[in-house]
Curated annotation (Swiss-Prot):
GO terms for biological process: mRNA catabolic process; RNA processing. Involved in mRNA degradation. Catalyzes the phosphorolysis of single-stranded polyribonucleotides processively in the 3'- to 5'-direction. GO terms for molecular function: 3'-5'-RNA exonuclease activity; magnesium ion binding; polyribonucleotide nucleotidyltransferase activity; RNA binding. HAMAP family: PNPase. Residues 658-719 form the S1 motif domain. The keyword Cytoplasm applies. This is Polyribonucleotide nucleotidyltransferase. Its EC number is 2.7.7.8. It comes from the Bacteria. The gene is pnp. Its main location: cytoplasm. It catalyses: RNA(n+1) + phosphate = RNA(n) + a ribonucleoside 5'-diphosphate. Its cofactor is Mg(2+). It comes from Campylobacter jejuni subsp. jejuni serotype O:2 (strain ATCC 700819 / NCTC 11168).
C-alpha cells in the first residue's frame, strides 16, 4: 500500500506492507531519487535490567550512489563516523517516546538504498524510522517528525536541500512530536568574502594574512524564532503521519514492566538513613561514581531487620530517595548538591602550553571536570579524507576534533578502546562549536585532541573551552574565543528550575541536557536532549538566556588566560606559499611523482600543489629546509624543457658536456651552489662535490659541465 504525503516542502512516498514484512514495522520511503528502508524489530523476552535496550543502525549502501566500496574489502564493513552520528541523531530523537517500563531488546535499522544528492538523508531517515516505529506494535503516542532549518540572506528556510545548505549561515536540525521538541542540534556556518590571499613568508608572517570572515553566531532571539518555525513544521508533519498511518498501526499487546514498589524499605530508609544519604549526595557531587550509595546499601543489608531484603531492592530504593532529595532541594530551596546556586558556574582554572613539544595545549579545569586539549598543525597531506555517499570524490577535512574519554576519568578500571558513539558525538559537537572561529584561509590543517582526565559532567563543553585556548596557544588566528556550558532542568508538578553548568549527578537525575557554545556575540553550536517527552519554548528561552550569562562569565576568565599565552614558535611548523606557471606543476611532480617524492625526502618537507592556480605550498619544521626546497623547485621550473620560454628563461643550446668555465658562485643553498657560467646561465654544483670547500658568494670557481637534462645544467669541479 502506498501513501504520498506533501509536507514541509517535500513530497514523501511511503510503501507499507511491501517489504520486510516479518519485521515489527517497516516502510520503504521515497523522496526525489532517494530511497530509504526503515525497519523495527524486537525480541519477545524482556531484559531484567532497568534500562531501555534500544539500538539504532544507519547504513549507507555504496550502490545507492552507483559506487563500489573502496579499500581492500569490496563491501560495506564498519560504519563511518557520518553514519554513526546519523544513527545517534535518530536514537536521541526516538528514545524519549518509548513508554516507561518498556524492556524489550529493540533494533531500528535504516538503510539508504538510493541516494539523491539534493535530498537531506538525515531528515528523511529519521522520518522513515519514525513511521516504521509508529506502525509497529510498540506503543507510541504519535509519530516523531524531523526538520532542518537554514538561513539564507537573513531569512529562515524550512528544509533546505543540500545545494541551499551550502549557502546557508545556519544548520538547525530539530525533532519533535506534535508541539513538543525532543532533540535539537544547531551549528553556525561561517561565510567568507572573496579576498585573494597570497602568502610568501615563513610562519610568523602567515598569522597576519587573513580574510574577512563572519562567524554568523545566532542570538538567543534568533534561535527561538527558528525553533518556532521548526515547531510548526513538526506539528504539521506529526499530524500528517498520524492521519495517514494510524489505521495501519498494529495492536499493541506488549506488557510493560510495573515499577516494583517497596513501601516498607522506602519508609525504613527515609526514617533512618536520610541524613547519611544527604551526606552521600554531597560526596557524589564531587564524582560520577555511586560508591557512597553502595556503602549505605551494605550497611542496611547487614542489619538483622533487613535480612530478607534483596540487594537490588535496597539499591533501587536508595536511588529513588537520592533522586527525590536532589530534586526537592533544587525546586524548594534553590540549592544544589554541591552548594551552588542555580545559575552558578563551578570554579575554573586554566593553564596553557604545559606540553613543551606540542604545538599548543591547554589544561582546562571546571569543578571536577578536567580536559587536556592539544592542538597540532600540519600540512595538506595531514588532512582527513572522507568519502561521502553523495559526493563523487572524497572531501578533505582540514579541521578535526578528537575526544577521548578513558575510564580513569571517572575512577573506573576499564580498558581504553576505539572511540564509540559517545566519543564521536562529543567530538563532533566541539568541532561544530569551534569551527566558525577558525579562519577558513588559514593554511594549516588543524587537529585538536581532547583528553578527558577527570569527569563530573560537561566534559564536551570543557573540550570547547580548552580547544579554543589551545588554538590560541598554537598561534592559530582564531576570530573569537568560544566557550561552552551545559544546562540542566528539573521539572515536577508544574514547577521547574533551570541549572547552569550541570554536574554528573544533575545530568543523571535531571530532565534535560542542553549544551550551548558560542562567543560573546552569540551561539555557534547547541545540542539538546530531553527526558520529559517534550519541552515548551518558555523553558527553552530561560535556558538560552541563562546559558548566555554563564558563557560570558566563562569567556571573561578565558580572556584573562589568553593574555598570558606565550606561543612556542620553536616547535611550530613553518610554511611558505608561492606561485609558479601552472604549466610547470607537472615538472615539479615528475614522471609518476618521482621528482616531488625526491624533494620531500631530500628536504624533509611536505608539499601541496594547486594545478589550476599554480600555487605551491611547502611546510616543514625548519625555515632553512623550506627555503632550500623552494629554491630547488624554482630551479626546476625556471627552464624546463618543452615549456614556453618567458623573459627570465635562459638559452642553453650552446652548452655541451665537458665544457669548462671559470664561473662565479651566485648563490649557496643547502643542496649545493649555483655557479654562473656565461650569459646569465647557471649550473648546479651539488653539495656532495664541495664538502671539503668553504665557498662564498661571488667566489671564482673553475667547473665543467657534467650533465644537461630537462633544461638544467649540473657541473663538477675541475681537477
Amino acid at each position: 500500500m502506498q501513501y504520498s504525503i506533501e509536507i514541509n516542502k517535500n513530497t514523501e512516498i511511503f510503501d507499507i506492507d511491501k517489504v520486510a514484512k516479518q519485521a515489527a514495522g517497516a516502510v520503504l520511503m521515497r523522496q526525489g531519487k532517494s530511497v530509504v528502508l526503515a525497519t523495527v524489530a524486537r525480541e519477545e523476552k524482556q531484559v531484567e535490567e532497568d534500562f531501555l535496550p534500544l539500538t539504532v543502525q544507519y547504513i549507507e549502501k555504496a550502490y545507492a550512489a552507483g559506487k563500489i566500496p573502496g579499500g581492500y574489502v569490496k563491501r560495506e564493513t564498519k560504519p563511518s563516523d557520518a553514519e554513526t552520528l546519523t544513527a545517534r541523531i535518530i536514537d536521541r530523537s526516538l528514545r524519549p517516546l518509548f513508554p516507561k517500563g518498556y524492556a524489550y531488546p529493540t533494533q531500528i535499522v535504516v538503510m539508504v538504498l538510493s541516494a539523491d544528492p539534493k535530498v537531506d538523508l538525515q531528515v528523511m531517515s529519521l522520518n522513515a524510522a519514525s513511521v516504521a516505529l509508529y506502525l509497529s506494535d510498540i506503543p507510541m503516542k504519535a509519530p516523531v517528525c524531523g526538520v532542518r532549518i537554514g538561513k539564507i540572506d537573513g531569512n529562515f528556510i524550512l528544509n533546505p536541500n543540500n545545494e541551499e545548505l551550502q549557502n546557508s549561515t545556519l544548520d538547525l536540525y530539530v525533532a519533535g512530536v506534535k508541539d513538543e521538541l525532543l532533540m535539537i542540534e544547531m551549528r553556525a556556518l561561517p561565510d567568507q568574502k572573496e579576498n585573494e590571499i597570497f602568502i610568501e613568508a615563513p610562519y610568523a608572517d602567515v598569522l597576519t594574512q587573513t580574510t574577512s570572515q563572519n562567524m554568523n553566531e545566532l542570538s538567543e532571539d534568533e534561535i527561538l524564532e527558528a525553533l518556532n518555525l521548526a515547531q510548526k513544521a513538526i506539528l504539521n508533519g506529526s499530524n500528517a503521519y498520524e492521519e495517514a498511518f494510524s489505521k495501519h498501526k498494529k495492536n499493541s499487546q506488549i506488557e510493560l514492566k510495573n515499577e516494583i514498589e517497596h513501601p516498607e524499605i522506602l519508609a525504613f530508609i527515609e526514617n533512618n538513613f536520610q541524613k547519611q544519604i544527604k551526606e552521600a549526595i554531597n560526596q557524589m557531587a564531587k564524582s560520577e561514581r555511586a560508591s557512597e550509595l553502595n556503602k549505605i546499601a551494605k550497611e542496611i543489608l547487614n542489619l538483622e531487620i533487613t535480612k530478607d531484603w534483596s540487594e537490588e531492592s535496597v539499591l533501587n530504593t536508595l536511588a529513588k530517595v537520592k533522586r527525590k532529595l536532589i530534586r526537592e532541594q533544587i525546586l524548594n530551596e534553590g540549592k544544589r548538591a554541591d552548594g551552588r546556586s542555580l545559575n552558578e558556574v563551578r570554579p575554573i582554572s586554566i593553564e596553557t602550553n604545559i606540553l613543551p613539544n606540542a604545538h599548543g595545549s591547554c589544561l582546562f579545569t571546571r569543578g571536577q571536570t578536567q580536559a587536556l586539549v592539544v592542538a597540532t598543525l600540519g600540512g595538506e597531506n595531514d588532512s582527513q579524507m572522507i568519502d561521502l555517499l553523495t559526493e563523487k570524490n572524497p572531501i578533505s577535512e582540514r579541521f578535526m576534533v578528537n575526544y577521548n574519554f578513558p575510564g580513569f576519568s571517572v575512577g573506573e578500571a576499564s580498558p581504553i578502546k576505539a572511540p564509540g558513539r559517545r566519543e564521536l558525538g562529543h567530538g563532533n559537537l566541539a568541532k561544530r562549536a569551534l569551527y566558525p572561529s577558525v579562519d577558513e584561509n588559514y593554511p594549516y590543517v588543524i587537529r585538536l585532541v581532547s583528553e578527558i582526565l577527570e569527569s563530573n559532567g560537561s566534559s564536551s563543553m570543557a573540550t570547547v573551552c580548552g580547544g579554543s585556548l589551545a588554538l590560541k596557544a598554537a598561534g592559530v588566528p582564531s576570530l573569537k574565543l568560544v566557550a561552552g556550558v551545559a544546562m540542566g532542568l528539573i521539572f515536577e508538578d508544574n514547577k521547574y528550575a533551570v541549572l547552569t553548568d550541570i554536574m554528573g549527578l544533575e545530568d543523571h537525575d535531571g530532565d534535560m541536557d542542553f549544551k550551548v557554545a558560542g562567543s560573546k556575540d552569540g551561539v555557534t553550536a547547541l545540542q539538546m536532549d530531553i527526558k520529559l517527552g517534550g519541552i515548551d519554548q518558555e523553558i527553552l528561552k530561560q535556558a538560552l538566556y541563562q546559558a548566555k550569562e554563564g558563557r560570558i562569565h566563562i569567556l571573561n576568565i578565558m580572556e584573562e588566560a589568553a593574555k598570558e599565552i606565550i606561543v612556542n614558535e620553536e616547535v611550530l611548523p613553518k610554511l611558505e606559499l608561492f606561485s609558479v606557471d601552472p604549466s610547470k606543476i607537472v615538472d615539479i611532480i615528475g614522471q609518476a611523482g618521482k621528482t616531488i617524492k625526491e624533494i620531500v625526502e631530500k628536504f624533509g618537507v611536505s608539499i601541496d600543489l594547486d594545478r589550476e592556480k599554480g600555487e605551491v605550498k611547502i611546510a616543514g619544521s625548519q625555515n632553512e629546509q623550506i627555503k632550500a626546497a623552494k629554491d630547488y623547485i624554482i630551479n626546476i621550473t625556471s627552464s624546463q624543457k618543452g615549456t614556453k620560454k618567458g623573459p627570465k628563461d635562459k638559452d642553453i643550446s650552446g652548452f655541451e658536456l665537458g665544457q669548462e668555465f671559470q664561473g662565479i658562485v651566485k648563490k649557496i643553498a643547502p643542496f649545493g651552489a649555483f655557479v654562473e657560467l656565461k650569459n646569465g646561465v647557471d649550473g648546479l654544483l651539488h653539495s656532495s662535490k664541495i664538502k671539503h670547500l668553504n665557498l662564498s658568494e661571488n667566489q671564482s670557481l673553475k667547473v665543467k659541465i657534467s650533465e644537461i637534462k630537462n633544461g638544467k645544467i649540473s657541473v663538477d669541479l675541475c681537477e
